[in-house]
Amino acid sequence: MKNLYLFLSIFILTISTSFADGHNIKKDGFLSKKFKVTKLSIIEDPTNKIILINNHGQSNFDGKQNFCTSIDQIRNRVSLIDEEINGKKIMLYNLCAHKIVGDMGKKWWFSKKPYEGKSKLDKRVEQNLELVEKLVSLGVPRKQIFVTGHSCGGLTTLLFFSRHPDKAGGGIAYMQACFDRLSKKYKVSKLGLEEGLARFKEKKPAQYDLRSQYNDEILKNLKVPLLAFTHPKDPFEGLTSDWLDQIDGMKRVVISKDYTIDGKKCFKLGKNKSDKFKVKDGHSMDQATCFQYYNPVILEYIGSRI
């Protein structure tokens, strides 16, 4: 038994070390094809650039986390760098929010108190607006700036356009979610949407109310045509995302029914060639290399907005 514990400890340490060696991305800036980060300064020929702002996910609802994203998570966004649409070249800006803390903090998730003040999501929306205005001041046309995001970053994207519809050209939400594994934890597949959400409300009434508040705001105010990707096996909001179809102009793409796209098995790739993992969670399907099958859909959407 001791030998087993020793083996597991060494195995975990080895994996942690390999990932820590440049795998995680901890700072803002423009990304290169080789995942190098360059600080925002002067943008060469800004009128002929398309800027995609990447909003990462979160490890908790309202608190800090150790890093903002990682190579495997952002690889597909990086694959769009230098693509040209109508003579305009795509750039990718990684926007880190890992140090932002909501007014009620990390412990609120375990509380039944109604949320008071600005949540981390609210502050991330403001952070995006500040960056958009900075890019515009550097000469990038507003219509050529796109707010995008995965998970909590995807929900940030939807909230951004419900509050600031004219500030950017468009947005892409990947697996929007920020309220835990609703689909899986509350057995939506077995019990149905209504019963699943009722159980969520019973267990976490304050969190249920804030999610409902955000969803209602988006349904009421979002008028900008956006692109959204979801997957039915996403344990977070995979089976609780049909409300997106009620939004006029929303193009929702249900990626697939399993862990393949166009008949190909899906893998995530890290920094090294050996960092190759099968996708076993629908929440990560937009991060698997097979998802690049949808790059033409993304490029077509961007082209329709500039």
Model-assigned labels for residue ranges:
Residues 178-255:
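The feature captures the conserved acid-bearing segment of alpha/beta-hydrolase catalytic domains
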Residues 43-85:
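Short, surface-exposed "cap/lid" segments of acyl-processing enzymes
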